Structures are given as C-alpha cells and as structure tokens.
Amino acid sequence: TGGALMARGAGVPACGRVDELTSTVDIYKILGKLAGYPIDAPYLDGNLPEVLGGQRRAYTVSNSIYPGQTYKLAVRTHDHALRLETQEKVDEDGTVDFAGARVGIYPRAHELEEDYALDSAELRAFFYPRARDFVREIANNGEFWPAMRAARPEWFGGQP
C-alpha cells in the first residue's frame, strides 16, 4: 500500500530506496536473514525480498476483517490493484457473505476511482483466482448460524 519498510543496524546492507512489493509477514524472513537464522522452514510465512537475495513478489494481499464491519480485500501488483468490499458485515465467526460484493480493478495510482476502473479479461484472469483462493475459508455463501444472527443486535447495540 505504499508503506515504508526500513531496517538499520550492524550488518544490514545499505540498499537505498527499493521499489519492491512487500507484506507485513515478510518481516520474519527479513529479520531472520539479517540475524543469520535459517529462513527456509516450511512453516515460516513470508517472502525474502529480492534486494536481500530472495525473489521479487508478483503480488501482495491485504485485508480488513472485523466482525460488524464490511470485509475489504486488496490484491496488488506493481501496476494494478483488485479492490473488493462486501455489502454484508463480517459475522462473529469470521465468515462473510460475498454475494453482491463490489469488486474493481484499477491502476495502482487510482485505486477505488471508478473513472479509472479497468475491465480486462487478462487482468481478471490474474486477479480473480488469487482473490478467490485467499477468501475461500471465510466465504460463508450466505449460510450462517441463526442463533448468532439473532444475538447480533444485543452484541452490536441494536444494529442488525
């Protein structure tokens, strides 16, 4: 999203300004590499950026998932971003109904600006499978626990 990632200390190479996609989970591999620990364990999430000897990311994923709020997803490449927001709020079990979600693909410099929305089979073929894979575990397809929905007004101060 344009956030800065900076590491400074003994043994940290001076890389200057680097234009590379990173994710917050990359910090584990970055710090592990800089501290001299092995970073190839299969349980270790993240990516070592190319500037530190790893591989450049093709895309990053960020999301906002809080019960009582709409779900938001961004899948970003260097040049484009898929942005998604559900109409329904995230349920207390962490699932959400994606029916009617607003989805658009935009140039990175114009995210969420509808005048810049792109409709391209090539971009859809890249972004849609990645977004689907990411939300597969939280999509409830409109099926939810009825007792939980009945209790929602009490939990959220009268809001359905």
Give the ranges of each region predicted by the language model.
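C-terminal accessory region downstream of the catalytic core in glycan-modifying enzymes
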Residues: 32, 79-160
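Substrate-binding rim/cap in mid-to-C-terminal beta-strand-loop elements of soluble/periplasmic
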Residues: 1-54
